[in-house]
Regions:
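Conserved nucleotide-sugar phosphate-binding/catalytic loop shared by glycosyltransferases and other
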Residues: 5-12, 24-77, 84, 240, ...
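Conserved donor-nucleotide binding/catalytic region of nucleotide-linked donor-dependent transferases
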Residues: 304, 312-328
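Active-site-proximal region of nucleotide-activated glycan assembly enzymes
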Residues: 117-174
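Nucleotide-sugar donor-binding and catalytic loop/hinge architecture
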Residues: 1-2, 171-193
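Acidic donor-binding loop of glycosyltransferase active sites
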Residues: 94-96, 253-262
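C-terminal alpha-helical cap of glycosyltransferases
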Residues: 317, 331-348
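Donor-nucleotide binding loops and adjacent catalytic segments primarily
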Residues: 185-252
Length: 348
């Protein structure tokens, strides 16, 4: 069996990580995978993994920051993009097309329909959730409003994030040695991670700064690359900025608590590491995803004004939060294989 995976974005962020994990899951079951990225994408994640890809047009469309006007504009770009996708699908003669999030989901879905091939969409945005379910089977990631209701719309089912190999099996000693490289780090203190994923949003910086000013009894870590230049100019001197790291699986086994935005694959990787979480809500474009409702009992959610209090609450309720995180860890780690089988079953 051969599959084409159509991926939105630049080939280096969270969407690409999700796509790569889907590819690994499919290949483990004997499926040959071809990759399609936007022609302008540097594809650094795939390059690092030694992968090649096909270049087509995959407009950024319907992301969480999308407005009605930008979504309409993106829809026109989609029209030409889907015909180019159809040509690639026919040329490769694949058995199934998997579109991953936003523009990737839509281009893959419509392209597959035009080429007369079955498709599966991984959806997570307002626009892909409107278009893709009308054309093929869809799997909604936890941020989607469709994740919790008992009766889902036709063609939409749930999926957790497919996770990378090694998640949940990191080595805390490796993380400790890395952290010791910072003169600010004190291994006798508890350690709290602040992160909004690969890109650092202003809200998570504010949260780290506020807590650093409130207490000096913890190591406060900040991970990621700033979304905009200048975001780190006012970073509190007591915050340890690690930048973008490739040893996150090790770090998650060392730290005592994670303060994350209420979305994204990092949240589930943290749960897979059996670690309690405080989610800082409405950081990314003001959106609210109710992750505490999806992963009940493992997450405390907070706004910026209550964050310091909720961090201390998380330590007070640590044992109960950890017990529930352990419960979700097993399901999270099984998702990659389970989702791959569901995709294969669409063809069968």
């Amino acid at each position: 069996m051969k599959a084409l995976i159509v991926i939105t974005g630049r080939g280096l962020g969270g969407d690409s990580v999700i796509a790569y994990n889907i590819i690994e899951g499919l290949e483990a079951k004997g499926v040959q995978c071809e990759i399609a990225l936007d022609e302008s994408a540097p594809g650094l994640l795939f390059k690092k993994k030694g992968r090649t890809w096909h270049k087509i047009k995959i407009p950024q469309a319907g992301g969480h920051a999308a407005t009605k006007a930008s979504s309409v504009k993106a829809a026109f770009k989609m029209l030409t993009a889907t015909f180019k996708a159809r040509s690639l699908i026919k040329k490769l003669d694949v058995d199934i097309v998997v579109g991953v999030i936003g523009g990737g989901a839509i281009v893959g879905s419509v392209g597959a329909k035009l080429a007369g091939k079955p498709g599966v969409s991984i959806i997570s945005t307002p626009l892909d959730s409107k278009i893709c379910p009308k054309l093929n089977q869809c799997y909604a990631l936890p941020e989607m409003k469709y994740f919790l209701p008992e009766h889902l719309p036709k063609n939409i089912n749930h999926t957790l994030y497919p996770l990378s190999e090694g998640v949940g099996n990191g080595n805390p000693d490796i993380a400790l040695e890395k952290l010791k490289e910072s003169l600010k780090f004190d291994e006798n203190k508890k350690t709290i991670l602040f992160s909004s994923g690969s890109s650092i949003f202003k809200g998570i910086i504010k949260g780290a700064n506020n807590f650093a000013k409130f207490s000096d009894e913890y190591n406060i870590l900040l991970v990621g690359l700033p979304l905009k230049e200048g975001y780190l100019d006012d970073l509190d001197e007591n915050v340890i900025y690690l930048g973008y790291i490739d040893w996150m699986s090790h770090l998650l086994t060392y730290i005592d608590l994670a303060v994350l935005t209420d979305d994204g694959v990092l949240l589930e990787e943290t749960l897979a590491s059996k670690l309690p979480i405080v989610t800082l809500t409405k950081v990314k474009w003001g959106r609210y995803h109710n992750m505490a409702g999806v992963f009940k009992g493992a997450i405390i959610e907070s706004d910026i004004d209550s964050l310091n209090d909720n961090i201390f609450r998380a330590f007070d309720e640590f044992d109960e939060l950890k017990k529930n995180a352990v419960k979700y860890a097993k399901e999270s780690l099984e998702t990659k294989s389970n989702l791959a089988q569901k995709i294969i079953d669409v063809v069968k």
